[in-house]
């Protein structure tokens, strides 16, 4: 596991862009993408670059259940706004959270990940160490699955919705097994709220109680983080 300390998210995005260029030069064809504030600056750097993704494929970590893709809170909408509209890929795959048959959609997406394993997977990490929507207790072997969101996740998402009953209670997420299948992984972490999760991910016991610790089992992980997120590391 390699750790790169950066001043802020802007520098983190620039560092990640250089790593992406290296992977593309080595023939990377499929990118695993994430949503949320952590990779936003990275996508901004990509959009401002001269990189061309018209022959590339992308696969996303997760999507909320019950939201149409044009819903501003859906992850498809987020990806369109921050990356796909400006830098189209040959194919961009996300789980379909509006699917009528969710079990069939989970199976379809898992098969798709088998056909398009990520050459480079982008990750953020939750304060409790979750990666994707894989909460503590998720098996390291897990494949794409339907997740019941924790009360704390539902509560923290409530600010984005007019009514509490509109807040999604489930998501479709890549499993930890799918994530570990990627050839290379970049994880972004910023702020002191992430310090405990990063300490456990890098130096803690490898345990399913801290999903991020699964990354210790992977041969090519780069963590891009600021001083605050790295503040609890012992070494």
Swiss-Prot record:
Pathway noted in the entry: Amino-sugar metabolism; N-acetylneuraminate degradation; D-fructose 6-phosphate from N-acetylneuraminate: step 5/5
GO CC field: cytoplasm
InterPro entries in alphabetical order: Glc/Gal-6P_isomerase, Glucosamine6P_isomerase, NagB/RpiA_transferase-like
One BP term from GO: glucosamine catabolic process
Residues forming coiled coils: none
Catalytic center residues: 62 (proton acceptor), 128 (for ring-opening step), 130 (proton acceptor), 135 (for ring-opening step)
Gene Ontology molecular-function annotations: glucosamine-6-phosphate deaminase activity; identical protein binding
Catalytic activity: alpha-D-glucosamine 6-phosphate + H2O = beta-D-fructose 6-phosphate + NH4(+)
The keyword Ligase appears for this protein: no
Enzyme class: hydrolase
Entries under HAMAP family matching the protein: GlcN6P_deamin
Family: Belongs to the glucosamine/galactosamine-6-phosphate isomerase family. NagB subfamily.
Name used for this protein in its record: Glucosamine-6-phosphate deaminase
Gene name linked to the record: nagB
């Amino acid at each position: 596991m390699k750790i790169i300390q950066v001043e802020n998210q802007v520098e983190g995005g620039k560092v990640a862009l250089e790593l992406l260029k290296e992977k593309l030069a080595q023939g990377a064809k499929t990118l695993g993408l994430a949503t949320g504030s952590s990779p936003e600056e990275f996508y901004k750097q990509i959009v401002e670059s001269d990189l061309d993704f018209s022959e590339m494929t992308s696969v996303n970590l997760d999507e909320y259940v019950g939201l149409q893709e044009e819903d501003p809170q859906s992850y498809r909408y987020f990806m369109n706004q921050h990356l796909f509209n400006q830098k189209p890929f040959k194919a961009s795959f996300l789980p379909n959270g509006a699917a009528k048959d969710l079990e069939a959609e989970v199976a379809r997406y898992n098969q798709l990940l088998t056909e398009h394993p990520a050459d480079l997977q982008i990750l953020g990490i939750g304060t409790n160490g979750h990666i994707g929507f894989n909460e503590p207790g998720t098996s390291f072997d897990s494949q794409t699955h339907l997740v019941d969101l924790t009360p704390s996740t539902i509560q923290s998402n409530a600010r984005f919705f007019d009514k509490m009953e509109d807040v999604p209670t489930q998501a479709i997420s890549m499993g930890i097994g799918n994530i570990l299948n990627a050839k290379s992984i970049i994880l972004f972490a910023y702020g002191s709220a992430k310090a405990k999760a990063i300490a456990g991910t890098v130096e803690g016991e490898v345990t399913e109680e801290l999903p991020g610790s699964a990354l210790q089992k992977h041969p090519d992980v780069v963590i891009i983080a600021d001083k605050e997120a790295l503040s609890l590391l012992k070494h």
